[in-house]
Amino acid sequence: MEQLSSANTRFALDLFLALSENNPAGNIFISPFSISSAMAMVFLGTRGNTAAQLSKTFHFNTVEEVHSRFQSLNADINKRGASYILKLANRLYGEKTYNFLPEFLVSTQKTYGADLASVDFQHASEDARKTINQWVKGQTEGKIPELLASGMVDNMTKLVLVNAIYFKGNWKDKFMKEATTNAPFRLNKKDRKTVKMMYQKKKFAYGYIEDLKCRVLELPYQGEELSMVILLPDDIEDESTGLKKIEEQLTLEKLHEWTKPENLDFIEVNVSLPRFKLEESYTLNSDLARLGVQDLFNSSKADLSGMSGARDIFISKIVHKSFVEVNEEGTEAAAATAGIATFCMLMPEENFTADHPFLFFIRHNSSGSILFLGRFSSP
């Protein structure tokens, strides 16, 4: 499991940094796990150079038995009886007149639980689009009502591969609503916006990265199987937000080092965190091409011969939509995501005031998988 989690985290950071280059100061929110799962399904059907590019970009080449590892990781994350709701759903929509290889369909069903739904792209592409959107809307509890905008599929579309992820979890320690107040959030050195700032004082896993002047806080969800980890720069240092320095050093090894439990102290922390909601939408073709996936999107070069006998199929678009809402109760996220305080005068305590931009991710603790990753820059 560890190999796959490491591969997925490396890709998560690669993609985050690619998106950050295009959008150095704005909000970002993705479910890298959802994108990796969807692309692993595509990987099943790729051959030759197309497969090699995917394998390298998604770091699948570092994982033995990548598909069976995904199968067990999905089962572990989606397990019944968990104290959170997390739904990861995959589906293939294929042109009904097109012949997909039976072994490809058997593999995607067995490994990723993805059935092939036959639709009529050729004569009724708009109806097909609505059908796909309706399914995603249902899987994400209505949070992603329109994954595919008008015109995204047409009569030449052969295959749409959909992955949706939905998460809702309550904090292990909820923020009291009555403690929430209006407070300024500093976007940069000059501009501010008012946010609803939540507050609580409890024992949390907290750390400080000296050379980056950055605080780390782990907020567990009920059941402690998932946590939100926040990286907050001390202050707005650089022209943007103090995050630049952190982002420049973001690697799998560093992230692991900064956030692993043995490097954090379990102490009293005064936590101020804004209530926030992000909805983002990405067409990932150019970002993935920059990271090395090129042939897949090229009709004359794509080799998807593991999906169909004919060499006439390629992936025209990879669309990713995501949603997250963080409030006093906990977090609701989708993408298409007991310390008893005793009173003691000498107890050290720390302040964690997220009143300026920060990075955050939602992690499945036992596997170390990053399910969602984002930057909150502006309400």
UniProtKB/Swiss-Prot annotation:
Primary location group: secreted
PROSITE patterns noted in UniProt: SERPIN
Stretch list, region CARD-binding motif (CBM): 351-379
Taxonomic path: Eukaryota, Metazoa, Chordata, Craniata, Vertebrata
Residues with Phosphoserine modification: S300
Name the UniProt record assigns to this protein: Leukocyte elastase inhibitor
Organism of provenance: Homo sapiens
Keyword field: Acetylation, Cytoplasm, Endosome, Lysosome, Phosphoprotein, Protease inhibitor, Secreted, Serine protease inhibitor
Matching InterPro entries: Serpin_CS, Serpin_dom, Serpin_fam, Serpin_sf, Serpin_sf_1, Serpin_sf_2
Functional description taken from the UniProt entry: Neutrophil serine protease inhibitor that plays an essential role in the regulation of the innate immune response, inflammation and cellular homeostasis. Acts primarily to protect the cell from proteases released in the cytoplasm during stress or infection. These proteases are important in killing microbes but when released from granules, these potent enzymes also destroy host proteins and contribute to mortality. Regulates the activity of the neutrophil proteases elastase, cathepsin G, proteinase-3, chymase, chymotrypsin, and kallikrein-3.
Family membership: Belongs to the serpin family. Ov-serpin subfamily.
Modified residues (N6-acetyllysine): K137, K177
Gene Ontology molecular function terms on file: peptidase inhibitor activity; serine-type endopeptidase inhibitor activity
GO cellular component: collagen-containing extracellular matrix; cytolytic granule; cytoplasmic ribonucleoprotein granule; early endosome; extracellular exosome; extracellular region; extracellular space; membrane
Tissue specificity annotation: In human bone marrow, present in all CD45+ populations. Expression levels are highest in the neutrophil lineage, intermediate in monocytic, and lowest in lymphocytic lineage. Within the neutrophil lineage, expression is highest in promyelocytes.
Coiled coil segments of this chain: none
